[in-house]
């Protein structure tokens, strides 16, 4: 097929208008290439304007681009490398390596970033808990294998640290492959994540094929085209492991809000009329197009964990609200919990999971979780009385509830492996069995004689007991 060649007629920020004289217009979502000061710039066709002109969105900076430059139509959408050759490497939205290492061994083994979601008869619907080693999640809002998890939280409450801990724990516990999409987040965090993965052995720099993770970055400094499409590029790599290798893959997105934000920027640049709060009119469609591909099939599964920034802590904002419809579990991070010094700062009562039922988790786990939530809920309803009248005015039974609730809150904290460098405390992976046993003792009153401080930042109940003894000795 002959290559269509056009010329740039207009450049406005990240949007570029290209005129094709010979009448063969590139299709919507086709990739175009252009030389920009010795570097290949990728553009993606977004609109056909008539008179042989298409409006395309740049995947990198358009600085230095001039009119009359030659643009080639590749005849296909953006394609990225797939397979084990991607392990241990960092890619950008168009599949170029950005970690300074050598090229991929099979440059022709690529896939288009657009794919149809699996058919209904190909999808699988089994319910099984994915053990994370994080007490508050495993007990009160457990993740399901092949499910979608949303991490909701405002700025600076610990979404990225929680994601990094999950990658670390799951790589060690399951040895499965993970794909991480850095969508519009800080470049420094992306660099920290890579360094920590190298240190913890999740990435093997000497033998990348032995690594357990692929990183795909489109960070804050990138134009909106890259931020809007980078999640698709990463998902394409995850789909290959699921469909062709039958793997159970973990797909991390940090941050899904930036995907929506980039879509809103593009929508405005392309002249679409905005909808509520200035978001794009196609918000639900864009989100559904990405989310419907993240699913489990009879071959393998993709379990996704998506950090969702909540603008101004308003959970009803259209961006986080649109994500809710697609999720199986929600882990809500709270500023109040973070201010109390309890990390991970998970709001135990606001977080939820569809698999929190005796049929999936077993009777014991379900009952302990419900009792813990009951005590925390009672404590929450007593807080107004305590604030006005003080603890002395409570009945003995209510006092006991308050003491237990405070111990539960402290015991829900946990030192993280990835935060060791900041806290100086070694991280803890707590098995589900130990988590259930520990909280069962707490709700049954077997720990009523132990001081509150003994439960703060420990792993299992044995560690809390050892800490209680050392506190008494002091």
From Swiss-Prot:
InterPro entries, A to Z: AAA+_ATPase, ATP-synt_VA_C, ATP_synth_F1_bsu, ATPase_alpha/beta_chains, ATPase_F1/V1/A1_a/bsu_N, ATPase_F1/V1/A1_a/bsu_N_sf, ATPase_F1/V1/A1_a/bsu_nucl-bd, ATPase_F1/V1_b/a_C
EC number: 7.1.2.2
Catalytic activity: ATP + H2O + 4 H(+)(in) = ADP + phosphate + 5 H(+)(out)
UniProt cross-references to Pfam families, sorted A to Z: ATP-synt_ab, ATP-synt_ab_N, ATP-synt_VA_C
A cellular component term, taken from the record's GO annotations: proton-transporting ATP synthase complex
SMART domains xrefs: AAA
Molecular function GO terms recorded: ATP binding; ATP hydrolysis activity; proton-transporting ATP synthase activity, rotational mechanism
List of residues binding ATP: 153-160
Subcellular location: Cell inner membrane
Domain of life (superkingdom): Bacteria
Membrane topology, from the record: Peripheral membrane protein
SUPFAM superfamilies documented for this protein: C-terminal domain of alpha and beta subunits of F1 ATP synthase (SSF47917), N-terminal domain of alpha and beta subunits of F1 ATP synthase (SSF50615), P-loop containing nucleoside triphosphate hydrolases (SSF52540)
Keywords of the record: ATP synthesis, ATP-binding, Cell inner membrane, Cell membrane, CF(1), Hydrogen ion transport, Ion transport, Membrane, Nucleotide-binding, Translocase, Transport
HAMAP family for this protein: ATP_synth_beta_bact
Subunit structure, interactors included: F-type ATPases have 2 components, CF(1) - the catalytic core - and CF(0) - the membrane proton channel. CF(1) has five subunits: alpha(3), beta(3), gamma(1), delta(1), epsilon(1). CF(0) has three main subunits: a(1), b(2) and c(9-12). The alpha and beta chains form an alternating ring which encloses part of the gamma chain. CF(1) is attached to CF(0) by a central stalk formed by the gamma and epsilon chains, while a peripheral stalk is formed by the delta and b chains.
Function: Produces ATP from ADP in the presence of a proton gradient across the membrane. The catalytic sites are hosted primarily by the beta subunits.
Family: Belongs to the ATPase alpha/beta chains family.
Protein name in UniProt: ATP synthase subunit beta
Organism, as annotated: Neorickettsia sennetsu (strain ATCC VR-367 / Miyayama)
Organism phylogeny: Bacteria, Pseudomonadati, Pseudomonadota, Alphaproteobacteria, Rickettsiales
